[in-house]
Amino acid sequence: MASLSVPCVKICALNRRVGSLPGISTQRWQPQPNGISFPSDVSQNHSAFWRLRATTNEVVSNSTPMTNGGYMNGKAKTNVPEPAELSEFMAKVSGLLKLVDSKDIVELELKQLDCEIVIRKKEALQQAVPPAPVYHSMPPVMADFSMPPAQPVALPPSPTPTSTPATAKPTSAPSSSHPPLKSPMAGTFYRSPGPGEPPFVKVGDKVQKGQIVCIIEAMKLMNEIEAEKSGTIMELLAEDGKPVSVDTPLFVIAP
């Protein structure tokens, strides 16, 4: 039988070096009885050998492959736009804003990736709505203002001239040669101080200068008319409750 000898020192050194390498696992091999006999010097001195197994680049069934971007955990990564894409998108948006301002565009919608922009222009709608009620309100206002002027024009002027000539007609001309007492103002002639009361003077009464002989109402004021001289009432020329004008003869007083 040939004998086999292996220096144990080299094997131990190899064990220390190999065991310290990353990714390499060491496993001690134990001989099992298989019916093969070795010389006594071999079986006693070399009963164990080291088996090396490298695990580098081995793929296990439950391991995750590594990609350039990192390990994939089974979930989809979120797509984040790059700065260049954002700048290009904003350039398009600014161009669209200029387009909306220069054209009659009411609404514009832009979608790109996960971004959505809606541009609405309300100036056109606001200018179109208000004119409608304005036109409906104008015609009735013009019609209302045109109607009233025709009514007040005809009524007031007619009664005033008819009443003034009536004042001069009832006044009778004095038959006496003495100058009459004339009215100093226009108004309504009253012989008594109030309704149902006796008159101030009658025909044939003697009066004194400064004595009240009648009342003339002008502008809602009662004006007392006094005798200009002392004498006797000869004639009564004005009618009670009738209007008189300036210088209308009222009485004839004879001294």
UniProtKB/Swiss-Prot annotation:
Transit peptide region: 1-87
GO process terms (BP): fatty acid biosynthetic process
This protein's pathway: Lipid metabolism; fatty acid biosynthesis
Metal-binding found in the keyword field: no
GO CC, any one term: chloroplast stroma
Comp. bias (Pro residues): 149-162
UniProt superkingdom: Eukaryota
Segments for region (Disordered): 148-193
N6-biotinyllysine, modified sites: 220
Domain Biotinyl-binding: 178-254
Function: This protein is a component of the acetyl coenzyme A carboxylase complex; first, biotin carboxylase catalyzes the carboxylation of the carrier protein and then the transcarboxylase transfers the carboxyl group to form malonyl-CoA.
Subunit structure: Acetyl-CoA carboxylase is a heterohexamer composed of biotin carboxyl carrier protein, biotin carboxylase and 2 subunits each of ACCase subunit alpha and ACCase plastid-coded subunit beta (accD).
Name of this protein: Biotin carboxyl carrier protein of acetyl-CoA carboxylase 2, chloroplastic
Organism, scientific name: Arabidopsis thaliana
